[in-house]
Amino acid sequence: MKKMMLLLAIMLLGITNASAQQNDEDLKIKPLLGLWQYAEEVATPDGGTTFIGKQIYKNITWDKKYYVTAGVNIPIKQSEAQETKTSTITFITQEGDIVLGSDNGYLEYINNHYLDNSLNNTISWLRYRFDEKNPNILYLEYNLNGNDENWVSEVWLRVMPYGAK
């Protein structure tokens, strides 16, 4: 009976420790969760800046998966007499896994890149920071060709927090 209780105590301790580690990982990824829209930061006439959203979205989920989708506008005209309408088709361009690194960086394991197969099964290191005044603005940087001169900067706007309906 004592052996059984000792075994049960060891199992519970192991589960508690694994659960605590999982919660730490959850806290690290929580600020990145949600649906993000790629944006271009442009100068305004008054000297400020504004963002122009593009039809590219990145969804980062609790299970540390990410999906990038893109939308393409296609003109549709069913007959000569009908006015041309525009329809947007959205498709997944990239999917993969995220491994958190330091406080301001993570690895993207690109499992599938549907527009550039040479990127399949590759790893990309990303540095990130949030806007000081708005945590829904994310600045990402990644190294394009593996040398220090080719860092690319992107701006992403959170359009929907994780779990929102």
Residue ranges and their predicted role:
Residues 1-4, 19-21:
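Positively charged n-region of N-terminal signal peptides that target proteins for export
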Residues 27, 35-72, 114, 119:
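Short, solvent-exposed loop/hinge segments that bridge or flank secondary-structure elements
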